[in-house]
Amino acid sequence: MKEIAMRNSKRKPEPTPFAGKKLRSTRLRRKRAQISPVLVQSPLWSKQIGVSAASVDSCSDLLADDNVSCGSSRVEKSSNPKKTLIEEVEVSKPGYNVKETIGDSKFRRITRSYSKLHKEKEGDEIEVSESSCVDSNSGAGLRRLNVKGNKINDNDEISFSRSDVTFAGHVSNSRSLNFESENKESDVVSVISGVEYCSKFGSVTGGADNEEIEISKPSSFVEADSSLGSAKELKPELEIVGCVSDLACSEKFSEEVSDSLDDESSEQRSEIYSQYSDFDYSDYTPSIFFDSGSEFSEKSSSDSPISHSRSLYLQFKEQFCRSTIPNDFGSSCEEEIHSELLRFDDEEVEESYLRLRERERSHAYMRDCAKAYCSRMDNTGLIPRLRSIMVQWIVKQCSDMGLQQETLFLGVGLLDRFLSKGSFKSERTLILVGIASLTLATRIEENQPYNSIRKRNFTIQNLRYSRHEVVAMEWLVQEVLNFKCFTPTIFNFLWFYLKAARANPEVERKAKSLAVTSLSDQTQLCFWPSTVAAALVVLACIEHNKISAYQRVIKVHVRTTDNELPECVKSLDWLLGQ
């Protein structure tokens, strides 16, 4: 029972005594002199007289980078045994942040040591006695202050009592003290530096708008006064002090170093080139077209004889019998386009169609030449028979090689245009014109590898032709056509008329098949390519009973006074019976 009673007695809460003001110590504090190393005063602050003083309980940091502890009679920094006595610092400024004033890294410490350079200040510990920071009003307990973060309200006044502080920091000989003000304009700064203590009182005062800072340092220091009249002069000066030295480039390039680098690079290049120069080319096999530069040109050099292709070209040129129609013959009539007729809905399509019609009328492929050419041709003659053979061969070659339809129609068009300008008496040479027309069209329309002559020999009707002969005939074809080789063909106009007819795939396939078949008929040469293309689409629509479709084709095509479409349709009517 006694044990239970003892346990219950222990559990009873004891009344807590009244916590009065706890005295720091019964020992009397010694009287200290009032010394301040920093004095900040503003003319506006000096006008504010009678402001009550508020005190700071304690401070944990004197600098942003140092750790402060309270518990000894002195503030010590382990890195330097020398001491600097800091007395009392009074701050009287409405809205001024003491944390920014005392702990900000902008206000750097200045000691008597100028002999050592670039010492590290990390890892230093500072001990502050309880008496170093005294609350002059309430005597409240110590509390920690965050030096970096916050700002104090406007009507605060803070005072610090003196304490013995030991610093171990070192300042380099070349260190310059730069002050940056976060307040408004018109700041004035004066700095007084020395090397020993002075017994003057220091005060730090600040205002909201204008600021004047005086830093009083021990009187035995070497004095260096610098004053700036206004903030307009101060701010550029501060920028010059802290920034100009950073903008200057300290690097200097030596000409000797650059010369040596050039020599080394040249030596490396010479070594690389020497390795390639010693390479053995005995196993190198040149391409079969390696000698084509001299064989297929006029001559290798000015002193060398003409090439074999050039000599063949001169022979073909002498054998060519030119017709009476001049080479630059143009259309005799300027046709007026009627704007009230049906047009394409798309403006781009309409513009492309009109430009193609203009090229057709103004190009070297002229209707009068074609009519004269057709009138001279006899079905029993040499030229119509050879032309039929060449057209069939061109169609077969394009099908076997998988060439485009544009190449097929351009090759046949070049052949007909050349024969309309003249012909040869030799059958062998006339067949060679067909080969050259296809190879030239292939160069224009096709991509690699078909845009060059890769065959060494061509065989048609038991006739063998060399590559030199084909190239020489290509030169003659281009010269006879006045180098106007890319002309509108029937296939170019088929797309426009099929679009106007709104043709389905069946009508489109039939129209293209009729176009290929019509190439063997020389009567289509008496009409414009656009007229032939429109007639072929009309025939394809008639076969599939698309009456409204071919009527739209007629309306789109008939834009000039010379409407030969009905005659062309009648002349090609036989194609539907094939």
From Swiss-Prot:
Q: What happens when the gene is disrupted?
A: Plants exhibit a severe defect in homolog synapsis recombination and bivalent formation in prophase 1, resulting in random chromosome distribution and formation of abnormal meiotic products.
- Read off the SUPFAM superfamilies from this record: Cyclin-like (SSF47954)
Biased-composition ranges, Basic residues, are 21-31
Q: Which Gene3D superfamilies match?
A: Cyclin-like
Q: Which domain of life is it from?
A: Eukaryota
Signal peptide, first to last residue: none
Q: Which Pfam families does the protein's record reference?
A: Cyclin_C, Cyclin_N
User: Biological process GO terms, please?
Assistant: cell division; chiasma assembly; double-strand break repair via homologous recombination
Sorted alphabetically, which InterPro entries does this protein's record hold? Cyclin, Cyclin-like_dom, Cyclin-like_sf, Cyclin_C-dom, Cyclin_N, Cyclins_cyclin-box
Task: Write the record's keywords in alphabetical order, separated by commas.
Answer: Cell cycle, Cell division, Cyclin, Meiosis
PROSITE patterns in UniProt = CYCLINS
**CDD domains assigned to the protein according to its UniProt record, in alphabetical order:** CYCLIN_SDS-like_rpt2
Q: Does the keyword Cell cycle apply?
A: yes
Q: Spell out the subunit comment.
A: May interact with CDKA-1 and CDKB1-1.
Q: What is this protein called?
A: Cyclin-SDS
Species in which this protein is naturally found: Arabidopsis thaliana
> Could you tell me the gene encoding this protein?
SDS
